[in-house]
Amino acid sequence: METGNAIVAREPSQPGVVHWSFEQVEVASPGDDEILVEMYAAGICHTDIVLSSVPAGTMGIDYPKVVGHEGAGVAKAVGKNVKSVAVGDPILLSFYYCSTCQQCEASHPSYCDSFNSKNYLGQQGTMKSKTGDEQIWAQFFGQSSFAQYSTVKEASVVNAKDLIKDISELKLFAPLGCGFQTGSGAILNITQAGPKDVVLITGLGAVGMGALMTAKIAKCKTIIAVDRVQSRIDLAKTLGATHTINTSDADFSTLDLAVRDLLPGGVSIAIDTTGVPAVIEQSIQSTHARGKTVLIGVPPMDYMLNIHATTHISSGRAVLGCIEGDSDPRVAIPQMIQWYRDGIFPIDKFVEYFDAEDYSKALDSLKEGSVVKPVLIWKK
């Protein structure tokens, strides 16, 4: 058992507002298929915020819990059945999957039968409060990386000993396990975009930037980047965006018109990372016949997609859901690292580090849009 600090999420006083606090917790020794990880860094993803700002009972979610699912650290102890990691190995963390269901066996682990329950809910039994023996929901996405120590599932682990040059790279690569992987996979796996494609990307957080860089790698002929923060738009221009739209003063209901002012024929692929209902529906309308819209951003829980069925049928359009970019982390993460070394996936342009106890500042930077990917540092 280890004792360390963690960011504990408690039930919010009102929906949409997180209630996080820096607390001491006790972390159990690893089970047979688990690894005790000393965390070095963890990216903050919008999913961490969404799934700790909803009332208890939503989707089965309970409190208190520790979130965080873009972790990086070093293995301190391993269970007897663990084969992919040895004590002392640096590791990168991603989502959990069972490896035995139909989707896992078909190499689509992000659509694992147990994905929702194991990743979004986690489980009790591996972490408790230092005072009062309060059981804490942990193993969020198999990892709960907003903690100094965490007992993680082997399935969530990518061994990084042959992928990194030093510990600074381990920290830099922490966010590859979700946001960048999701955006990249939306282009690479979900849409299989190529040189003939015209791509619209709404929202330039880590997911959107991952999609943008991968669209450039895929040699898509036109890439339209949309955001409300000018600094992100300026950065997108340097990374391959051929057109940009700033929505800071725009009516979202006219986004389709703005896109068609640039490209009257519309786009072949629209990637929505915002989860804003009006943006989602305008993205769909921006696609031409047989175009694809990929939904990644999480909309309000009660939102129902508004599509005119007859028009949709005649257009041949497709609206696709996307979890983790339909990626296999043990393939996707090494690929993104190689792209980084090749200078075509420069994630260092997006990352800003914060001490773990300064998580409030990191959250503010994300909300303001001044930082694309805040990363919490657990070990300096």
Regions found by a protein language model. Give the residues of each.
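Glycine-rich Rossmann-fold phosphate-binding loop(s) that bind the pyrophosphate
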Residues: 203-206, 298
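C-terminal hydrophobic helical "lid"/dimerization subdomain
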Residues: 1-2, 258, 281-285, 326-380
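Adenosine-nucleotide cofactor-binding segment
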Residues: 198-204, 216-282
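Glycine-rich beta-strand-centered segment in the early N-terminal region that forms part
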Residues: 26-42, 55-106, 110, 161-167
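Rossmann-fold NAD(P)-binding glycine/threonine-rich loop
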Residues: 298-316, 334
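Glycine-centered, small-residue-biased loops immediately flanking beta-strands
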Residues: 291-292, 317
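NAD(P)H dinucleotide-binding glycine-rich loop of Rossmann-like/cofactor-binding domains
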Residues: 100-198, 202
